[in-house]
């Protein structure tokens, strides 16, 4: 998993509450178990018209936000079913950070497992970030995970809280398998060294 240390990128605003996982990645894209290629289906019911053409009104289709790395979204993002395809689709599109006042628990945990930083902020901070994100091409935020700060385009800085274990895993690029190996590595190395010293009949 890619390490998350500092992220600087355009933030796209989505002033919509209760965006569920069905809207993040519709069911027709769930047939695959691959993590790649799902970015095409991200928010597809909002991104595309019925004829398959792009909806020009959707934020990620607008020139200023096509390469957004950060989403600033409404309350209760990622609610609904527990599909891990939702963070897969976000990551494949290029989204590394999502900021809201609250997330569904399963989605929140799945983000961390897939290298996406989900940040919870109070309503007044979210409104400030929405205003920053609505600047279009100038909507650049800088996320410093080690310092737990969000720096806006005007230089203002907001602080956020994060669980220390989640922070450690993201900073070091550790998913569940990587974390297990990281924790067990000394014991594994000692066991292998002991085996190497044994005399086999």
UniProtKB/Swiss-Prot annotation:
<dbReference type="GO" id="GO:0009098">
    <property type="term" value="P:L-leucine biosynthetic process"/>
</dbReference>
<dbReference type="GO" id="GO:0009316">
    <property type="term" value="C:3-isopropylmalate dehydratase complex"/>
</dbReference>
<keyword id="KW-0432">Leucine biosynthesis</keyword>
<keyword id="KW-0028">Amino-acid biosynthesis</keyword>
<dbReference type="Pfam" id="PF00694">
    <property type="entry name" value="Aconitase_C"/>
</dbReference>
<dbReference type="InterPro" id="IPR004431">
    <property type="entry name" value="3-IsopropMal_deHydase_ssu"/>
</dbReference>
<dbReference type="InterPro" id="IPR000573">
    <property type="entry name" value="AconitaseA/IPMdHydase_ssu_swvl"/>
</dbReference>
<dbReference type="GO" id="GO:0003861">
    <property type="term" value="F:3-isopropylmalate dehydratase activity"/>
</dbReference>
<dbReference type="InterPro" id="IPR050075">
    <property type="entry name" value="LeuD"/>
</dbReference>
<keyword id="KW-0456">Lyase</keyword>
<protein>
    <recommendedName>
        <fullName>3-isopropylmalate dehydratase small subunit</fullName>
        <ecNumber>4.2.1.33</ecNumber>
    </recommendedName>
</protein>
<dbReference type="InterPro" id="IPR015928">
    <property type="entry name" value="Aconitase/3IPM_dehydase_swvl"/>
</dbReference>
<comment type="subunit">
    <text>Heterodimer of LeuC and LeuD.</text>
</comment>
<keyword id="KW-0100">Branched-chain amino acid biosynthesis</keyword>
<comment type="function">
    <text>Catalyzes the isomerization between 2-isopropylmalate and 3-isopropylmalate, via the formation of 2-isopropylmaleate.</text>
</comment>
<comment type="pathway">
    <text>Amino-acid biosynthesis; L-leucine biosynthesis; L-leucine from 3-methyl-2-oxobutanoate: step 2/4.</text>
</comment>
<comment type="similarity">
    <text>Belongs to the LeuD family. LeuD type 1 subfamily.</text>
</comment>
<dbReference type="InterPro" id="IPR033940">
    <property type="entry name" value="IPMI_Swivel"/>
</dbReference>
